[in-house]
Amino acid sequence: MPTTLRPSPISKGALLVVALLLSLFPARVAVVAQDDDDAQRVERADNFDRAEDEEDLNRELWEYVKGTPYAGVLSYVAAAQARAEGARVAEAVLPTGWKLAPAGRQVELGRLPYEAVPFAGRLVVLNTGYYTREPQEVSVVEPASGRVEKTLRINSLFPSASVGPGGDLYISGGFDSKVYRVNREFNVAHEYAVAGFAAGLVPIDERRLAVLYLAGKDEKGNYVSGRLALLDTETGRVERDADAGYFPYAVRFVGGKFYVTVLGENRLRVFDRELKEVGEIPTGRRPQEMCADGARLYVVNTDSDELTVVDTASGRAAGVLRTNSFGSPFGTAPTSCAVAGGRVYVTLAGLNAVAVYDKRTRQQAGLVPAGWYPTKVLVEGDNLLVLNAKGVRPRRPNPRGPQPSTSVGGPDYVLTLLKGSLSVLPVGDVSARGLASWTRQVLAGAPTFDARRGFKLPVKHVFYVVKENRSYDQVLGDLGRGDGDKSLTLFGRDVTPTQHALAEAFVTLDNFYADGEISVLGHSFTTSGYASPFLEWLGNAAYSGRYRGYPFGMVPSVTSPAYLWDALDDAKVSYRIYGENYYLYTRAYRILSEELGAQSELARRFYARTMSLASETDRGRVFYDFAHTYAGRGDTPADAGRLLADEKFTAGLSNFLVGDGSLAAALQSNVRLRRRFAEYLSRYAFDYRSWDLTHSDLDRFAAWRADFERQARAGAVPRFNYLWLPNDHTNGADTRIRTPQQFVAQNDAALGLIVETISRSPVWRDSLILVEEDDAQNGPDHVDATRIVAFAAGPYVRRGAVVNDRYDQLSALRTAGLLLGFRPLNLNDRMAVPLFGIFDARPNLTPYTAPAPTALSDADRARYEELRRAK
């Protein structure tokens, strides 16, 4: 039986902590044997958040650090259960601080439901989330009772399903390159193999089915653009296919033509029955789903907060339906639509609501509160049905505690905890009076920050340090103050003296949250304050091992519309990026698409190159390997302009970004393009290594310090500095690079040296240092699966204070924006509550002295002492 949840109405003004135990991740132990060859060790060290590793790492770390079997954690279960149960409350609060109280009856489903279709008197729901090596789930729901009558297990699902004229249901098999035919008894009657990753599909007659391939592979195994194929369901053969561009997502068959949303190219492509392309229609950013009303199509543009209304008779856009009235460029994240009774219903994942529009005027009539991250809306009979991808219990108490289960995909991993839901409410309740009340409720659930309050602190320099995957309890549970649980601490004071000292000397932030569950979402939030609906889905697919690639922060279809560096450039605020690959790829593509056009040859070569890189994994050393020898030669736009005259360097840059010499040729002939690339290069430190566990964070510190001291001598320290310090990620229990404690101690020591160096520099008097993790996926925590360690230091930061105010990564972005004068990036950080509670108007200029590290490897200790002597 499903769990039926009836959340209480919002209790206004409450800021609460809903207890959740993120425990020790059960799963298969992936300790690499000592006699494995070095290639396996290096592969694991190079691969950033390998899907099959992440759930294992905490179990490995627990057994290695505690020196006892994983089952030893059982002694802590009783206390954890009591805390979790005692903290249950009716109101649900997201990591962002937004509050949930969805309308209607709530039915709990599987993980990340993204698609639903009425079929044979039931609602068939595709749960497309994190299911490790177990199959994903198709739930057969009786909407009136909310009962899940049957569950089908299909290994891989893309969020697309459609009923054919013959009465059967077709389901897209995603990364398994299959299509499934389900009969009216809800059994899989047949499966078909196709030649690419199956995406959107639509039957066109009793025999033929149009299927999109999200992407394909070439003979070298590289990912290439997608296709539109016609599948003969009687023979199982593909009759014909045609190129459909980068990441075609959904297909509709209207008036004898196929309409395909091309998510990666921001357009709708039109094909005739023979798959000859007969037109294209520009859309907004990241078009995904569509809904139809006769000859009109509504195309949902997820990243530009609008629906493109298409007149299929004329083949032209007939207007736009806008979903954002909040004064921010994007962020409501529309995900689906339905047309019924003179209205258009649109799910807004960024507002946790369904927007209701008058179909004729295209004006918004109001908002209906939904659960967390609504992804699908339907009107079926008398009911409005809404899928909520992340459910209605975002901060889930886990009363079973950290079970030492050996099952794959156990109940304690952060993505496993996310269970979706179905909201069911009478469509008649969506009246003018009901909408007015519901709209107020949705808006009342937002954080309450008023931007006019502002800051009046003389902070001119912000140093923004991002680390990897640690929860609060895992590091600071033994702090002795704040809300910590020392029984869950793996890297306590004996390993992380700097982090403990920072929490004690400045502020203890024990109520600070990551906005994404995993690193691909976390880095999107730390760099852009946003993660697109496609990224949310693809991230879950990658971490469950279904998608074997790493396009994140690289391939344009999975990047954000705007990043920190875009806002900084617009505000003419100087900045410097250390190690964050997202900058290298996203900024380069923006320049190419703005200067030459997204359909230009160079922009398309960039797309192909990043698709090729993504088929391997995220290679953090690709840029460093060719560029580090040029360190110091591109630190200003003028210097970088001269460097672009160096044929060898420009050839390396061209190969890095487009895979051949075509960019080098364009840079020589196009003065404006060369000028913009010179500015782009001058913002990135060539000799600061990105992801690579074989490279010490102490060496990253050394590269940063040399850069910083040169800037300080010249009086040219950038106002915003982004540093990625990744080695607290660890390599699990594989100790041939370092032990887990040594990795974390190395990271801790490097952080201490960074803070100390800034505090003894001329810019300390007007600086703020903010430190946070990208996510908490790899650590236990008794409060919440997304609670992370975070630190603040600077003359205007309070000393010796415990700050219990609720903050998140968006709070840090908003704080930096207010202090430095750059605009909010989107709705998320525009509504975020800044870090008001950390500040003191009276400066304390006392420098910070980092404590001596205690758990370094011999090599790191020697390097640390060398760096100390060199200061």
Which residues does each predicted region cover?
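Bacterial N-terminal signal peptides
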Residues: 14-25
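Short amphipathic alpha-helical segments with coiled-coil-like heptad repeat character
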Residues: 2, 111-117, 430, 510, ...
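Sec/Tat signal peptide C-region and signal peptidase I cleavage site
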Residues: 28-32
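Predominantly soluble domains enriched in secretory-pathway, periplasmic, or organellar proteins
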Residues: 34-455
